[in-house]
Amino acid sequence: MGQKVNPVGLRIGVIRDWESKWFAGKDYADFLHEDLKIREFISKRLSDASVSKVEIERAANRVNITIHTAKPGMVIGKGGSEVEALRKALNSLTGKRVHINILEIKRADLDAQLVAENIARQLENRISFRRAQKQTIQRTMRAGAQGIKTMVSGRLGGADIARSEYYSEGTVPLHTLRADIDYATAEADTTYGKLGVKVWIYRGEVLPTKKNTAEGGK
């Protein structure tokens, strides 16, 4: 089962948290579509800023957005001009008060989303899919990963028949729920059509913290 299911979704509530943190009753569908709009808008506007994920929290008529990026300077802009323009654009998009936090990703080579997008950009620049995957794997392992697996699917090298090729190094224990596995996908637009990129990165085990419960009657 661990081989088929999304590794991030499988671990939510175990060692990972939700990326949208809010509760809603009858407004659930509206909030959900608003979240999708916000994420799509940010990914298009900050396509060159190495954005890994966007967390959204809601309280009354306020939306708190946390952007995880490897290039915070590009998101913030000179004197905060870019982030202020982004906040105003999101205000008008949602009709609510938007507050934006920027969190820097210290080690981009251990972030599956950024690694997948990096491979996709290399494929668009006509770099061999084998070379792109092998170089990326070496960089990620040097950065401290315990294992990585990458897969590229589509008309590889312009072949008539689409296929998938994957490379891996180290271990990627998909069944182990306490294993911190980051997973992401990306797409590369080439002259022969789209290529799909998938990346799994094993960053070590997350041991659950024991809660100290007072024993009754003692």
Curated annotation (Swiss-Prot):
GO terms for molecular function: mRNA binding; rRNA binding; structural constituent of ribosome. The keyword Transcription regulation does not apply. GO terms for biological process: translation. PROSITE patterns: KH_TYPE_2, RIBOSOMAL_S3. One of its GO terms (cellular component) is cytosolic small ribosomal subunit. The keyword Isomerase does not apply. Residues 38-106 form the KH type-2 domain. InterPro entries: KH_dom, KH_dom-like_a/b, KH_dom_type_2, KH_sf_prok-type, Ribosomal_S3_C_sf, Ribosomal_uS3_bac-typ, Ribosomal_uS3_C, Ribosomal_uS3_CS. Gene3D superfamilies: 3.30.300.20, Ribosomal protein S3, C-terminal domain. Keywords: Ribonucleoprotein, Ribosomal protein, RNA-binding, rRNA-binding. Part of the 30S ribosomal subunit. Forms a tight complex with proteins S10 and S14. Belongs to the universal ribosomal protein uS3 family. Binds the lower part of the 30S subunit head. Binds mRNA in the 70S ribosome, positioning it for translation. This is Small ribosomal subunit protein uS3. It comes from Bacillus pumilus (strain SAFR-032).
